[in-house]
Design a protein with these regions (language model features):
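Terminal substrate-recognition subdomain of acyl/acetyltransferases
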Residues: 1-12, 121, 131-132, 137-204
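A short beta-loop-alpha structural element at the N-terminal edge
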Residues: 13-25
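Helix-loop element at the rim of GNAT/NAT acetyltransferase active sites that forms part
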Residues: 20, 28-44
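Acetyl-CoA-dependent GNAT
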Residues: 43-91, 100
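A short, internal acetyl-CoA/4′-phosphopantetheine-binding micro-motif in the GNAT/acyltransferase core
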Residues: 69, 96-105, 133
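Basic nucleic-acid-binding interfaces
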Residues: 81, 113, 148
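Conserved acetyl-CoA-binding loop-helix of GNAT-fold acetyltransferases
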Residues: 99, 105-120, 127-129, 139-145
Length: 204
């Protein structure tokens, strides 16, 4: 049984690949996290300045970054899949995720993990790695449910998920989901612009 697929547990959610033009929204999303959430996400209580530096330093050419937007085009959940610079690190990727409090309980973290697994497989990577605080039980539960091996060392834990090779199904699924996310984002943009137009007319 392929435990790297968690799709049966959660509904399909449009997940969009993020690029440099989303940098400001990424920063806004992370700045909305409170102190405890920042601690769990980064492993330390990141300040606003540190978060802004993190967002500015994102390498969209090397890494994969995904987001889930609500109807207002607010980034309510995002994942960062980081790849090392060295050639020997090309087969491995590290996963990090954050979900705003108001959007929790809907399986967004697991869906983002599932999306990251699929893309990593399609890119020929064989291991997805998670480094988390041991108290970050939600993140570690997602990893365990996907079949990852979790090793605890005091206040920190590492999870390793071995990935099977890509298949025609994973490649086609990723292509379809990318297209669906683009269409969904376009609809939300149009709806937002229409609402802004109506509001401006009513305000005149």
């Amino acid at each position: 049984m392929d435990k790297t697929n968690t799709r049966s547990s959660f509904p399909l959610v449009p997940i969009r690949s993020l690029g440099p033009r989303h940098r400001e929204r990424i920063a806004k999303h992370l700045l909305a996290l409170d102190g405890s959430d920042r601690y769990l996400r980064f492993g330390y209580a990141a300040s606003d300045e540190q978060i802004n530096r993190y967002a500015e330093g994102l390498n969209f050419e090397r890494d994969d970054i995904y987001g889930i937007f609500n109807r207002k085009l607010e980034l309510i959940a995002m994942a960062h899949v980081a790849v090392g610079d060295e050639p020997e690190q090309a087969k491995h990727a590290e996963f990090g995720v954050s979900v705003l409090k108001a959007a929790r309980g809907r399986g967004f973290g697991a869906r983002l993990f599932d999306r990251a697994v699929m893309h990593a497989r399609n890119e020929g990577r064989d291991t997805l790695f998670i480094h988390a605080l041991s108290e970050n039980t939600a993140m570690l539960k997602i990893a365990r449910n996907a079949g990852a091996t979790v090793e605890r060392s005091g206040s920190e834990s590492d999870a390793y998920l071995k990935l099977p090779a890509a298949t025609l199904a994973t490649r086609l699924t990723e292509m379809v989901e990318d297209q669906m996310a683009e269409v969904d984002y376009g609809f939300k943009q149009q709806a937002k612009h229409f609402q802004e137009l109506v509001s401006s007319i009513q305000g005149d």
